[in-house]
Design a protein with these regions (language model features):
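Active-site acidic Asp-centered loop
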Residues: 36-37, 80-82
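Cell-envelope/extracellular polymer assembly enzymes that use nucleotide-activated donors
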Residues: 3-5
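Short, well-formed alpha-helical segments that are part of the catalytic scaffolds
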Residues: 12-26
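Donor nucleotide-sugar binding loop of glycosyltransferases
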Residues: 13-16, 38, 61, 87
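Hydrophobic/aromatic residues located in beta-strands of well-ordered beta-sheets
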Residues: 31-33, 105
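A conserved acidic beta->alpha catalytic loop
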Residues: 35-43
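Short, structured coil segments at secondary-structure junctions
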Residues: 27, 48-50
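Acceptor/aglycone-binding surface of glycosyltransferases and processive sugar-polymer synthases
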Residues: 57-59, 63-70, 76-79, 88-141
Length: 141
């Protein structure tokens, strides 16, 4: 998986990001952490981990994604959460699928059949269903 870069935006994630990076050690891919330039706690927590740290020029999650994506040099990338909410065991499967089926991109969702999340409540699920339905009315692919 050396042809894959994980783009990991992080802000105030010094307490959990080191464990996420430890879990990602077994995957031979690049780990690009985009950190708010003033977030000394996160930077110091991960500076000895096997990752590249990119300090954001402009603040905000969207800007972190843009700056990170613009920095990627590998043919494939994955936007990965810094808080450990994604299970990396699916990375190989998703990368194989994109290569074998010649896809341009893949979306993963915890709301697909046989997927889920431990932190979803009934209200969260109901709200997501309603907003997805409304979004599909206007932006159906």
């Amino acid at each position: 998986m050396e042809n894959l870069t994980l783009v990991i935006p992080a802000k105030n994630e010094g307490s959990c990001l080191p464990q996420v990076l430890d879990e990602l050690k077994k995957f031979e891919c690049k780990k690009l952490i985009i950190v708010d330039k003033n977030d000394i706690g996160t930077i110091s927590a991960i500076e000895n981990k096997n990752c590249e740290i990119l300090k954001q020029k402009t603040s905000g999650y969207g800007n972190a994604l843009i700056e990170g994506i613009n920095h990627v040099k590998t043919p494939f990338m994955c936007i990965f959460n810094a808080d450990g909410s994604f299970d990396p065991k699916y990375l190989s499967e998703m990368l194989n699928k994109i290569v074998e089926e010649n896809n341009d991109f893949i979306f993963a969702s915890r709301y697909l059949q046989n997927a889920g999340s431990d932190d979803d409540t009934f209200i969260t699920l109901l709200g997501n269903k309603i907003f997805s339905f409304i979004g599909n009315l206007f932006f159906k692919f």
